Amino acid sequence: HLKRGNINSFERFIESIKEEVSKILRKPLVKYFITSTISFDRTKDGVHFSKKIGESRLTVGSHYPRLLAFDAWFLNGFGDVNQNVPENYARIWASTRARTEEQAANQMLRDIELYMSVYNITYGSRRGITIGRRSPLNSVRLGPVQILHDSVGKVIKDIVYYEPEFTVQNSPHIIDDNQARIQRYVSIFINCLERNALRNLLKASMRQYSYALNLNDPRISLVGLWSCLEILTGTTGDK
């Protein structure tokens, strides 16, 4: 049985959580951006894809808008990170409104992941998983760095994501007329997904599937694919 002192401590703990949640909910919604690169070839100028996905407006193009351009010194500050950013990758950026920086980053990355999962599931590699392979199966992947920006485009230095095991896609997808048709199909696919009654379950399983095929180690990929199956079937490892 809980002693009275323990009950009081627990109640104070619950109240402190409620207070923190209340503070967050009282914060105004603020616009944020996130920038990265993606394995589409950037040689063709212009915007290649722009769509509202989930809580974010996502855009793929050859160059960042001027608002989000940042000095090279920022990436240079990460040493080897700058050397790993592929120059032939297209630029990808997203915007959303959120109450905290962390919430904004999570929302946008989840929506970017959904976009890439639709593309990879529909048009991704048909290569099977082979033991000994040390590169991801997904052909559409983000670059090694994702950077958060505030509403005026200023870099938020405390929230930068870096993938230390980044593997470059040596032959990025070429943006041509066929690619434009594919992007339109992806857009229609996402629209249909949003209207589906099981959209949350489907989104979660698609993200898990895509995440599993982003991994370098095929053995870990198989574990991730099993988790995807568990999400879809509503089962766990002990069932």
Predicted features by range, described:
Residues H1-V223, S227, I231, T236:
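Charged, non-catalytic interaction/linker regions at domain boundaries
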Residues K239:
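Short, charged amphipathic alpha-helical segments flanked by flexible coils
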